[in-house]
Amino acid sequence: MPKSQKNENFLDKTFTILANIILRIVPMAPTEKKAFAYYRDGMSAQSEGEYAEALQNYYEAMRLEIDPYDRSYILYNIGLVHTSNGEHAKALEYYFQALERNPILPQALNNTALICHYRGEQAIQQGDPETAEVWFDQAAEYWKQAIMLAPGNYIEAQNWLKITGRFG
């Protein structure tokens, strides 16, 4: 097993253990506990590549969760599942919904930028450099926002912004 996969499994197991502890010791209303349990189960299924099961759990968590901040993370994870499935338009919808509830979610901004960049690359392959530039400019704007929120992250994006003259 590759070391990175071992680390991911370790992190997933650690998250599950911590989530179970939180469910037991943190005072929450029964509905909040249920929502958190569905979220935890969704993350577990997602980490195992069980995307349909993950979505079912996330949708159930969304039905129960009322806190906008917590909902933003559920929406973000739904976006991740759609990204993993290659459903970029759906993923963008969920990233935008997550950002509406939590505008300082740099990972949603980063993933939105990645999809825009990917679409720019596709436009280049299709021989449409003008459309590619529009997508790349959008990617740059999302990356700048993500970098502003998390300056030490997204080094590759920072390099791309500098190389393409969009870092300013």
Curated annotation (Swiss-Prot):
It is found in: Plastid, Chloroplast thylakoid membrane. It comes from Gnetum parvifolium (Small-leaved jointfir). This is Photosystem I assembly protein Ycf3. Gene3D superfamilies: Tetratricopeptide repeat domain. The keyword Phosphoprotein does not apply. Belongs to the Ycf3 family. PANTHER family: CELLULOSE SYNTHASE OPERON PROTEIN C, TPR REPEAT-CONTAINING PROTEIN MJ0263. Pfam families: TPR_1 (PF00515). Essential for the assembly of the photosystem I (PSI) complex. May act as a chaperone-like factor to guide the assembly of the PSI subunits. GO terms for biological process: photosynthesis. One of its GO terms (cellular component) is chloroplast thylakoid membrane. The keyword Transport does not apply. Its main location: plastid. It is a peripheral membrane protein. TPR repeats lie at residues 35-68, 72-105, 120-153. HAMAP family: Ycf3 (MF_00439). Keywords: Chloroplast, Membrane, Photosynthesis, Plastid, Repeat, Thylakoid, TPR repeat.
